[in-house]
Amino acid sequence: MDNPTDSAGKCPVAHGNTPRSRSNRDWWPDQLNVQILHQNSGRADPLGQAFDYAEEFKKLDLDGLKKDLHALMTDSQDWWPADFGHYGGLFIRMAWHSAGTYRITDGRGGAGAGQQRFAPLNSWPDNVNLDKARRLLWPIKQKYGNRISWADLLILTGNVALESMGFKTFGFAGGRADVWEPEELYWGPEGTWLGDERYSGERGLAEPLGAVQMGLIYVNPEGPNGTPDPLASARDIRETFARMAMNDEETVALIAGGHTFGKTHGAGDPSFVGVDPEGGELEAQGLGWTSKFNTGVGRDAIGSGLEVTWTQTPTQWSNYFFENLFAFEWELTKSPGGAHQWQAKNADASIPDAYDASKRHLPTMLTSDLALRFDPVYEKISRRFLENPDQFADAFARAWFKLTHRDMGPKVRYLGPEVPAEDLIWQDVIPAVDHPLVDDKDIADLKEKVLATGLTVQELVSTAWASASTFRGSDKRGGANGARIRLAPQKDWEVNQPAQLAKVLGVLEGIQKNFNAAQTGAKKISLADLIVLGGAAGVEKAAAAGGHAVSVPFTPGRMDASEAQTDAHSFAALKPRADGFRNYIGGRQFMKPEEALVDRAQLLTLTGPEMTVLVGGLRVLKAGAPEHGVFTSRPETLTNDFFVNLLDMGTQWSPAAGRDGVYEGRDRKTNDVKWTGTRVDLIFGSHSQLRAFAEVYGQADTKEKFVRDFVAAWTKVMNADRFDLV
């Protein structure tokens, strides 16, 4: 057989494993990345498009699975022995780190797709040796197959670990379907592990990031940049946990609850540890961090480099964490691996050894643990938990459930018999449908009533878009269901044009009130439905004005959430700083406008063509800032004029003097200004792939296709949060 690496037989595909393999992004690193719109598109899914995980999960023998997981907890393996004879601490850390990447700023990260299996997360320094945890689980995953996803299994195993050590959990919901390729997420600007170029000014952490250093889940347990300062650590903890949507009480409960179990690993110098899983050789088979320190496992294991066991009963739920935290004064010391940690003064050796029952050690803590005592706010909460163990247990159970379910969206997505009955405000509760829904005749009549009010296409379309486009496919939050656009904070967002919004909502509420009052039975229409229906009426009117008769699909069933069901502070995270679909920029930005457009399109689960057709349609319908990007002489008519005029070689573009981010399109012959546009508008003529999409919609023979595709993409956004329709 010929040598496959001979120059005459080089593979024509660039695999990225030799110096000759340079991607387009290597050549043009600042090029707009549109590929994130097509990741996890389904072509890489070995289960196929027809696979329905929710249906498979219903077939799962959950009791049998949990029984097997309970047995695994104490089935210590020689190749990776269990600390204290119990894998509970390891599996809690695995589940925590699967969920703990979640960040509220953009809803990305979290446990929802099982991304811990893939790079870069599988090789983050903070995830050291979690590859072993997942390998311990493989026989169980192999046994139960497609009825339990890796994403669900990682979290369920953490729950079972807690239960097996005497803790009563709040519940568990399945429903996390696996993906089959790594997500392209912005984890930070650094090019080295544990770099912290993400900070500016006085400890200002860049957004949307949620960790202090590249490759960490939250904070450095030794203290900021390894400086053992508990108060400085508290500042980092408060910031990073808040970015994960946790308040101070939840933060204290999570840290203390998690550190009630298990231990850290720092038996020797980290220099003994080999490369991470993704950088390993073929024969390593995806396992990394092989240690050459003595046996490299068990008592000789090296992970974080810290060597801390927090409690006297590391395989049983207790209140020892707080008892130890406040019982002793603490002195700075170093682990055998050289990491900063703290040791109790004048204490008895009461902490068991993980592998020798005859040995005892002095109590130890991390710098980040001592933050719970020396920060005045955390200290008050910690003392309350010390004195009220039942409150601590309840707070940890609830915070753990929130941690592991935060990115799953509304309860309608929860699966299984262990779903808790209680509604929690962070679940963005929407009332269940409690009345008959409108039928086709009602829908037609309501459309006529909406159009008869004199509300314009622009007003109807922009209001519906504002309501629906808050949806985030990352954590399944936002969307039109609930009609929260009428509540604080959304009703006051500048991007939603509050004065116009109040006018439109007032008119629609009048129609809703009159319709509901006129019914002889219990039939009703919610404002959430009527907002979307009004948008559909506006789109149909605009299409008709352009010579296209279309019917925009509409499915009733949305309900209206109340103020009591809405955490206004939490919803503030959904406020767009930029919305390229509406040509809006407001506030401090952390990406270019065109990058923000693609970012929002990805959150809306749109493809490149869907994003393109929506921008073109929304521009001519004047759904956003009216002064830029409206490349048409017949606004509020659904046409492909945006693309026709953008691609017109009779127009020459140049930056507008004194107007940052604004461009003027001038007639090449007369030099008269024809249009003004933004970076978001011009990117569809500048970026080669987006231009290819734009050219399709700018062709003379695709006017009908443009309208048809716009309606389809519009409907997709309007229904993005209709999990009841899936």
UniProtKB/Swiss-Prot annotation:
<feature type="signal peptide">
    <location>
        <begin position="1"/>
        <end position="16"/>
    </location>
</feature>
<dbReference type="GO" id="GO:0070301">
    <property type="term" value="P:cellular response to hydrogen peroxide"/>
</dbReference>
<keyword id="KW-0408">Iron</keyword>
<keyword id="KW-0560">Oxidoreductase</keyword>
<feature type="cross-link" description="Tryptophyl-tyrosyl-methioninium (Tyr-Met) (with W-96)">
    <location>
        <begin position="218"/>
        <end position="244"/>
    </location>
</feature>
<feature type="binding site" description="axial binding residue">
    <location>
        <position position="259"/>
    </location>
    <ligand>
        <name>heme b</name>
    </ligand>
</feature>
<dbReference type="GO" id="GO:0004096">
    <property type="term" value="F:catalase activity"/>
</dbReference>
<feature type="active site" description="Proton acceptor">
    <location>
        <position position="97"/>
    </location>
</feature>
<dbReference type="InterPro" id="IPR019793">
    <property type="entry name" value="Peroxidases_heam-ligand_BS"/>
</dbReference>
<dbReference type="GO" id="GO:0046872">
    <property type="term" value="F:metal ion binding"/>
</dbReference>
<dbReference type="InterPro" id="IPR000763">
    <property type="entry name" value="Catalase_peroxidase"/>
</dbReference>
<dbReference type="InterPro" id="IPR019794">
    <property type="entry name" value="Peroxidases_AS"/>
</dbReference>
<keyword id="KW-0732">Signal</keyword>
<dbReference type="GO" id="GO:0042744">
    <property type="term" value="P:hydrogen peroxide catabolic process"/>
</dbReference>
<dbReference type="InterPro" id="IPR002016">
    <property type="entry name" value="Haem_peroxidase"/>
</dbReference>
<feature type="cross-link" description="Tryptophyl-tyrosyl-methioninium (Trp-Tyr) (with M-244)">
    <location>
        <begin position="96"/>
        <end position="218"/>
    </location>
</feature>
<comment type="function">
    <text>Bifunctional enzyme with both catalase and broad-spectrum peroxidase activity.</text>
</comment>
<comment type="subunit">
    <text>Homodimer or homotetramer.</text>
</comment>
<keyword id="KW-0376">Hydrogen peroxide</keyword>
<keyword id="KW-0614">Plasmid</keyword>
<dbReference type="GO" id="GO:0020037">
    <property type="term" value="F:heme binding"/>
</dbReference>
<dbReference type="InterPro" id="IPR010255">
    <property type="entry name" value="Haem_peroxidase_sf"/>
</dbReference>
<feature type="site" description="Transition state stabilizer">
    <location>
        <position position="93"/>
    </location>
</feature>
<keyword id="KW-0349">Heme</keyword>
<keyword id="KW-0575">Peroxidase</keyword>
<protein>
    <recommendedName>
        <fullName>Catalase-peroxidase</fullName>
        <ecNumber>1.11.1.21</ecNumber>
    </recommendedName>
</protein>
<keyword id="KW-0479">Metal-binding</keyword>
<dbReference type="Pfam" id="PF00141">
    <property type="entry name" value="peroxidase"/>
</dbReference>
<comment type="similarity">
    <text>Belongs to the peroxidase family. Peroxidase/catalase subfamily.</text>
</comment>
<dbReference type="GO" id="GO:0005829">
    <property type="term" value="C:cytosol"/>
</dbReference>
<feature type="region of interest" description="Disordered">
    <location>
        <begin position="1"/>
        <end position="26"/>
    </location>
</feature>
